[in-house]
C-alpha cells in the first residue's frame, strides 16, 4: 500500500474522505433511488432491499474489521487520520441516520403500495377469516419446522446464523407463575412475507415474524406470553488468509465453517422493543447500546422485494432486450473470422453477454482449437461458461481454469465449481495464495495452417451471466498477437509464477499498475506545463488509494482538468481551491450497476480525439487492486473501439445529469 504523505499545512481530513463514511454516503445514494418517484414502484422497493443488503455486507466485512482492530489494539491511523475507534463511532452515528431515512422510505413506500392495492398488514388489522387462514398456515407450514427453545440451564441459547432472524419471548408458566424466556429462530426456508390474498387486484401480506408472535401461545400452551422481541444479527464474516497454508482449498473449507460462528457486530430490533428482553439479548451477544440498531415496522428490510408479485408492467422498468453484436452478424456468427478481421468491443448489458458464452462454446466445438485458458472470479453454479469449458476438455482440448477461491462470499461456490471442472478434465489452478486473481481474461489457442493463432477476450466484469444483465461492463475481443502474447504471459505468471520480463501492451497488478497510473498522470502534468491540452477522464467503482489521490491533486494544481465517474467509495475531495479545484466527481446510480473501469488520458490533444490514450481494466484505484491483486490494464488501439469508448460511454457518462 502506498503511504502517500499529504500537505502538513492542511488538516488531513480536509484532503481525504474516510473510506467507511464514503461507503455509507454511497449507500445513501442507493437509498435515495427508493424515494425517486420517476422510478417504477417495484423498482423503488428493490432499491430499498438493495440498500439493506448492502448495509448488512458492509457490517459483515468493514465494520467487523474495525471491531477487530480495536480488539487487537491496532493503533495505526486510517489514511484520513482516524483511529479505528474514531471510525467506528462515526460509522455508528451515520448508520443510525441512514436507518432513519430507511424507515422513512419504508413508510412512504407502504403508502404508495397501498394505492396499488398492495398492503403489508399488521395482525390487529386482520378479520376473522384472515386469522383462521394464518392459523392454519402456522400449524401446517411454520410449526413443523421451527425449533422453539426455552432458555434455562438445561437448554443452552441456540446458535443463530449470520443474517439470522429470531423472536425472543418472555413468558410466565400459568400454574407456577414462573418467568421464562424462549427463543424461536425463523427458518430461512420459509418466506418473510405470507400472502393473504393474491388476486389480480389485491395483494395483502403479513410477516412471518408477526404470525409466529400471534400464535406463540400455541407453541407454549401452558404459558402466558408477556412480551416479544423481533431481532436480526449480523456476524463478522471476513476470512483471514494464511499465505503459507499447505492446502488452500482445505484451509478455506475450515475457514468458511469458522466464519459461520463469527462474532455479532450488529443487532437489529424494532423500535420501542421491550427493554427487559432487549437487555437480555444484548448481553447474550455482548453488544452495548451503541451497536443496537432500531428499525420501524420491519426487521430485515432486504426481504421486502418478496412482495413484488403483482403482474402490472407499470410497476417495473420496461423490459430491456440487449442488442445482438453487429460485427458477428456481418460474419454470420463465425467468431474467429470476426475477431481476426479486427478488434471489437461489446458494451454490456446494452449488447448481449451471450456473445462471451458463444465465444467459449465455439472454441469448445471447433476442431482447430487446441487449448483454452480462463479466469473465473464469480459465476453462477449452472454457468454456461463452466459447461463450455467442461465440454472443451471432454473434446480433448487442453483447458486451464484459474479459479479464485478467495472471492468474498463465493469461496464455497468456487470450490464446488472447481471440483466440477476438474471431474471434466479441466486443469484447475488457484493462483497466488497472497494475491486474488481479479483479472477477467480468456485465451483461445487455435491451429491455423502451420501456425497457432491466439484469440483473447478481456473484460472489466465477471464471467457471470446473471450479473451481466444488470452490470455495465466492457468486453474486448482481439486477435492482436502482441496483445495475445501478453495474455499468454499473464496466464503463465498466474499458473506457474513465471514473472514476465517484458509486456508489450498490457499492464499488470501487482507488477506495474501503480507505476502506470502515476506515469500517465505525470505525463498530463508535464503537458499542462507546456501549454498542451491536459485532461483525464476516468470511470471506476472506487477511488481510495492515497498515492493516486495525491497525484490527482498534484495534477489539478498543475492545471490538468480531471473528470471522474466513481460509483461507490470516493476518498478524494473535489473542487477545493488550491487542492482539487480542477477535479469533478460524479456518481451514477440507476437501473444498471456501473461496473466498467475505463481510464482516458488527453496525451497532448483535446478530448475526445484519436490521439487520446484509452485503457480498460479490471482494476479500481484502491491499494488492493494496485498492490494485492492480479489485475490487467488493456490499451484500446483500434480506431473504431477507441472512438466508441470515448464518445458513446465516457462523454455520454459525463453529460448524464442524473446522479
Residue spans for each PLM region:
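Glycine/threonine-rich ATP-lid/beta-loop region of ATP-binding domains
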Residues: 546-549, 553
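N-terminal localization/anchoring segments of enzymes in phospholipid and broader phosphate metabolism
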Residues: 1-536, 554-558, 570-592, 598-659
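Cofactor-pocket helix-loop regions in the catalytic cores of large enzyme subunits
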Residues: 541
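Hydrophobic alpha/beta core scaffold segments
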Residues: 561-565
Amino acid at each position: 500500500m502506498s503511504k502517500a504523505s499529504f500537505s502538513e499545512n492542511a488538516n488531513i481530513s480536509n484532503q481525504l474522505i474516510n473510506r467507511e463514511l464514503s461507503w455509507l454516503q454511497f449507500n445513501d445514494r442507493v437509498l435515495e433511488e427508493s424515494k425517486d418517484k420517476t422510478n417504477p414502484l417495484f423498482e423503488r422497493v428493490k432499491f430499498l432491499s438493495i440498500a439493506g443488503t448492502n448495509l448488512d455486507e458492509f457490517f459483515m466485512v468493514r465494520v467487523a474489521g474495525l471491531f477487530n482492530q480495536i480488539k487487537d489494539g491496532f493503533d495505526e491511523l486510517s489514511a484520513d487520520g482516524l483511529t479505528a475507534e474514531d471510525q467506528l463511532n462515526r460509522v455508528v452515528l451515520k448508520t443510525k441516520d441512514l436507518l432513519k431515512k430507511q424507515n422513512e422510505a419504508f413508510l412512504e413506500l407502504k403508502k404508495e403500495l397501498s394505492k396499488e392495492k398492495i398492503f403489508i398488514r399488521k395482525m390487529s388489522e386482520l378479520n376473522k377469516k384472515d386469522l383462521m387462514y394464518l392459523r392454519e398456515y402456522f400449524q401446517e407450514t411454520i410449526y413443523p419446522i421451527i425449533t422453539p427453545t426455552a432458555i434455562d440451564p438445561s437448554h443452552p441459547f441456540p446458535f443463530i446464523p449470520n443474517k439470522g432472524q429470531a423472536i425472543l419471548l418472555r413468558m410466565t408458566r400459568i400454574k407456577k407463575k414462573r418467568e421464562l424466556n424462549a427463543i424461536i429462530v425463523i427458518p430461512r426456508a420459509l418466506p418473510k412475507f405470507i400472502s393473504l390474498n393474491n388476486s389480480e387486484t389485491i395483494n395483502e401480506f403479513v410477516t412471518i415474524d408477526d404470525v409466529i408472535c400471534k400464535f406463540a401461545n400455541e407453541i407454549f400452551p401452558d404459558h402466558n406470553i408477556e412480551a416479544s422481541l423481533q431481532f436480526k444479527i449480523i456476524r463478522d464474516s471476513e476470512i483471514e488468509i494464511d499465505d503459507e497454508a499447505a492446502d488452500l482449498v482445505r484451509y478455506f473449507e475450515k475457514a468458511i465453517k469458522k466464519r459461520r460462528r463469527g462474532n455479532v457486530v450488529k443487532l437489529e430490533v424494532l423500535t420501542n422493543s421491550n427493554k427487559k428482553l432487549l437487555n437480555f439479548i444484548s448481553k447474550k451477544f455482548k453488544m452495548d447500546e451503541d451497536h443496537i440498531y432500531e428499525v420501524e415496522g420491519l426487521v430485515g428490510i432486504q426481504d421486502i422485494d418478496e412482495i413484488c408479485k403483482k403482474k402490472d408492467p407499470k410497476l417495473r422498468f420496461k423490459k430491456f432486450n440487449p442488442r445482438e453484436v453487429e460485427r458477428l452478424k456481418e460474419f454470420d456468427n463465425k467468431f474467429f473470422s470476426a475477431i481476426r478481421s479486427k478488434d471489437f468491443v461489446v458494451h454490456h448489458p446494452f449488447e448481449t453477454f451471450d456473445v462471451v458464452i458463444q465465444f467459449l462454446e465455439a472454441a469448445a466445438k471447433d476442431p482447430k482449437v487446441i487449448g483454452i485458458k480462463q479466469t473465473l472470479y464469480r459465476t453462477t453454479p449452472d454457468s454456461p461458461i463452466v459447461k463450455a469449458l467442461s465440454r472443451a476438455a471432454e473434446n480433448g482440448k487442453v483447458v486451464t481454469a484459474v479459479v479464485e477461491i478467495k472471492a468474498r462470499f463465493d469461496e464455497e461456490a468456487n470450490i464446488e465449481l472447481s471440483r466440477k471442472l476438474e471431474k471434466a478434465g479441466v486443469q484447475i489452478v488457484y493462483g497466488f495464495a497472497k494475491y486474488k486473481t481479479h483479472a477477467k481474461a480468456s485465451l483461445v489457442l487455435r491451429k491455423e495452417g502451420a501456425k497457432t493463432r491466439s484469440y483473447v477476450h478481456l473484460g472489466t466484469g465477471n464471467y457471470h451471466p446473471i450479473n451481466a444483465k444488470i452490470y455495465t461492463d466492457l468486453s474486448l475481443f482481439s486477435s492482436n498477437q502482441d496483445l495475445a502474447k501478453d495474455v499468454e504471459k499473464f496466464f503463465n505468471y498466474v499458473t506457474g509464477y513465471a514473472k514476465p520480463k517484458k509486456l508489450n501492451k498490457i499492464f499488470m497488478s501487482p507488477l506495474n499498475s501503480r507505476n502506470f497510473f502515476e506515469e500517465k498522470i505525470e505525463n498530463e502534468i508535464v503537458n499542462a506545463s507546456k501549454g498542451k491540452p491536459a485532461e483525464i477522464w476516468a470511470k471506476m467503482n472506487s477511488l481510495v488509494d492515497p498515492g493516486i489521490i495525491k497525484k490527482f491533486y498534484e495534477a489539478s494544481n498543475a492545471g490538468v482538468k480531471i473528470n471522474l465517474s466513481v460509483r461507490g467509495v470516493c476518498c478524494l475531495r473535489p473542487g477545493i481551491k488550491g487542492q482539487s479545484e480542477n477535479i469533478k466527481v460524479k456518481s451514477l446510480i440507476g437501473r444498471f450497476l456501473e461496473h466498467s473501469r475505463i481510464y482516458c488520458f488527453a496525451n497532448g490533444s483535446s478530448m475526445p480525439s484519436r490521439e487520446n490514450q484509452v485503457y480498460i481494466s479490471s482494476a479500481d484505484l484502491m491499494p488492493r487492486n494496485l498492490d494485492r491483486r492480479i489485475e490487467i490494464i488493456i490499451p484500446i488501439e483500434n480506431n473504431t473501439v477507441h472512438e466508441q469508448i470515448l464518445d458513446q460511454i465516457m462523454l455520454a457518462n459525463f453529460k448524464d445529469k442524473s446522479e
